[in-house]
Amino acid sequence: MTNTVFINKHADLVEQCKRGESKAQYELYKHYSKAMFSVCMRILNHVGEAEDVLQEAFIDAFAKIKDFRQQSTFGVWLKQIVVNKAINQLRARRVELVNIDDYDFGGDEYDVADYDESESYSDTDMKYEVERIRRAMEQLPEGFRVVLSLYLFEGYDHEEIGNILGISETTSRTQYMRAKKRLLEIVKGQLF
């Protein structure tokens, strides 16, 4: 049995927040707000809603900070609050996951045989590619985008995604595979 050891570099700020020190709250907000906003955007794909969810998440986190036991980092704990708030916002929109049977995607998988590892990308090329993918993700149906984001960017497994979204693990896996396939189609079809 191994014990996981981690260093919580913001433990002092968390303790100050538990004592009600607003300056510490501001420091934690400054440190985490940009990353947490990105999480919100990946899930919600709407700036106004992402900003609202971010603020609500920080308010909840600071209100419940006395319950934080530092069994994980503050960032992990906060991210869980942010993801839950964003998912709840999606539910409030009453958006349903895409019925995958309504889409005909053709073949089973993309052929990656034409990928050439010798191709190298400059930083500019890489930024361009990242931007293309970001734009393509915005075009995905909401259900696809949410599952893809939770799996790839937030690190949830399909069982956890199923529990969060109220779908089966199999549906999560299928949504993920279809989302990847659709994303590739969108990216291949983009002309910039």
Regions found by a protein language model. Give the residues of each.
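Short, Lys/Arg-enriched C-terminal cap helix and immediately downstream tail that follows
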Residues: 91-94, 140, 145, 175, ...
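Short, charged helix-capping/linker segments at alpha-helix termini
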Residues: 2-3, 18-27, 37-56, 169, ...
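Structural recognition of an alpha-helix C-terminal capping motif at a helix-to-coil junction
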Residues: 38, 52-59, 72-84
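Helix-turn-helix DNA-binding module
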Residues: 131-146, 150-171
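Sigma70-family region 2
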Residues: 18-19, 45, 55-73, 92-94
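C-terminal edge and immediately downstream basic/flexible tail or linker adjoining helix-turn-helix-like DNA-binding
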Residues: 1-7, 16, 98-101, 132, ...
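Arg/Lys-rich amphipathic alpha helix in sigma70-family domain 2
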Residues: 66-69, 80-101, 126
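Internal acidic/polar
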Residues: 6-7, 96-123
